[in-house]
Amino acid sequence: MGTETKSNSYTGQISTSGGNPKVMKDSLSLVRQTVNQQTLSLSQSNQVQNQLNSHSNSNSYPNPSGSENKNENEQNSRDIRAKPEDKSRKEAIVPFVPIFVEEADVIQGAKELLKVIRPTWDLSHVEFKIRVVPQIEDRYPAQNAMVMMTLYSFTDGITNKLVGCFHKEISKLNDENGGSYLPIKTQGLSPVQSEDPVIIEKEDDDEFTDDRAADDGSPVQYSDNVVLVRIYGNKTDLLIDRKAETQNFLLLHTYGLAPSLYATFKNGLVYEYVPGTTLNTDSVLCPEIWPLVARRMAEMHRKVRKHGDSSATKPMPMIWKKTQSFLDLVPERFSDAEKHKRVKETFLPIGRLREEFNKLYEYLEALDSPIVFSHNDLLLGNVIYTQSLNTVNFIDYEYADYNFQAFDIGNHFAEMCGVDEVDYSRYPKREFQLQWLRVYLEEYLQRSNIQNDEVELLYVQVNQFALASHIFWTVWSLLQAEHSTIDFDYVGYAFLRYNEYLARKVEFLSLTAAKNNK
């Protein structure tokens, strides 16, 4: 199919070669010879600290900087793999491995990557856990199923594939929260070994986890024995700036807000795993958990600044530039005739959908919500709860960028309704939102005397920006419907988001900030 354009994620150097190279089984020497140890410059530690004391605008809320968090030391100890900052370190070096991992052969691709980034690992002692699409009952009838406990299924959202690589004894662990890793329908069967491993599907979407405490009460640490390999979905480069994603990964790591990035390859990342359990529509409402999410988001919004940014420069919000870009890419005619028919019968023409978004954006921009560095995709599967540490961490930074504060929160509230089984009756009620937002503001503004007026103002902004979230993911879903190879009904999901936008539009745009109302 012509030539493949290859862009190094760190230098922007471009080269071309014929075709898409497949993973070669005996490519270790080639890979090691061509690993490109490029560098991505990050701010020095003193520059980072200076950036913490600046705020990108002076909008609805006072500048949150200035007062130090009295629990800062405690919080740092709870951050992902938080370590003392090396004052002499100026650059983060991340290897680039020139491998393209085929979606149909992700295990072999993961093995080739491990040969480079974990050369001391004996691959015969490594077990893998990957995402598979078919349901377990469809492929392995219970009455004569023969399964092995080598490969397990879990998901990485609905656009990428994720492979967990577990070295030695890590594979023997059970999930304390969910019991055996064998699905309920196959429990009690004797595991068997086979030259061709059988892949079974886990019934939930939790990360591989083990929160158990050691004898001294500290959490069990297995990160060094686990590597996660993410393979990007088909044509997702149309939606996501992969160089920016890598920069975001490293940036957030310097703040203790992201795990270590071990390497990149042509169509993915290799990184440290985060122990814990992904949230679901029930746990996200638990009083032990939701305040952790609110504070973690506020911490990101308050602290993170890109190197070189200053209060004099107001960044372009992600929601504007990404939505416009996606609208440009949605095809006038879908290549799949059935999808095209469904889209045509369900949605406004793209030109009118753009007009609808532009009018909404003009209204939302006037709300003067602060522009902060945001995650922008806090669906429940991107929030990891570690019970033994009583912490949450966010994963997946594909859409992280500067954006309106209220969008990040409103988007998270909308995601509380689920993805695979969306139920918009789960959208958080007013009283819950007010509690959540008060906790958020305490962390964001670094003070406890939050006024009711401040909470009310943010409540209005958040719900009105939730409308923008619905349009954004509607357009995103239409684009995915054309290009993604993941087995997911993107047209159906777009329909759900767009209908919820229409259902809530008048209600949310009618909101006004009530004063002195708890």
UniProtKB/Swiss-Prot annotation:
Where does the record place Basic and acidic residues bias?
69-88
Concerning Pfam families, the annotation shows: Choline_kinase (PF01633)
- Which pathway features in its UniProt record? Phospholipid metabolism; phosphatidylethanolamine biosynthesis; phosphatidylethanolamine from ethanolamine: step 1/3
Domain of life where this protein originates: Eukaryota
Q: Which residues form a coiled coil?
A: none
Deletion consequences: 'Bang sensitive' phenotype; induction of paralysis with electrical stimulation results in a brief seizure, followed by a failure of the muscles to respond to giant fiber stimulation. This is due to an excitability defect caused by altered membrane phospholipid composition.
Q: Where is the composition biased (Polar residues)?
A: 1-19
The entry's keywords = ATP-binding, Cytoplasm, Kinase, Lipid biosynthesis, Lipid metabolism, Nucleotide-binding, Phospholipid biosynthesis, Phospholipid metabolism, Phosphoprotein, Transferase
Q: Which residues span the membrane?
A: none
Q: Which CDD domains match?
A: ETNK_euk (cd05157)
InterPro entries with a match to the protein in the record: Kinase-like_dom_sf
Kindly state one GO CC term assigned in the UniProt record.
cytoplasm
The protein's job, in short, is:
Highly specific for ethanolamine phosphorylation. May be a rate-controlling step in phosphatidylethanolamine biosynthesis.
What the record says about family reads: Belongs to the choline/ethanolamine kinase family.
The name this protein carries in UniProt is Ethanolamine kinase
The source organism is Drosophila melanogaster
> What lineage does UniProt assign to this protein's organism?
Eukaryota, Metazoa, Ecdysozoa, Arthropoda, Hexapoda
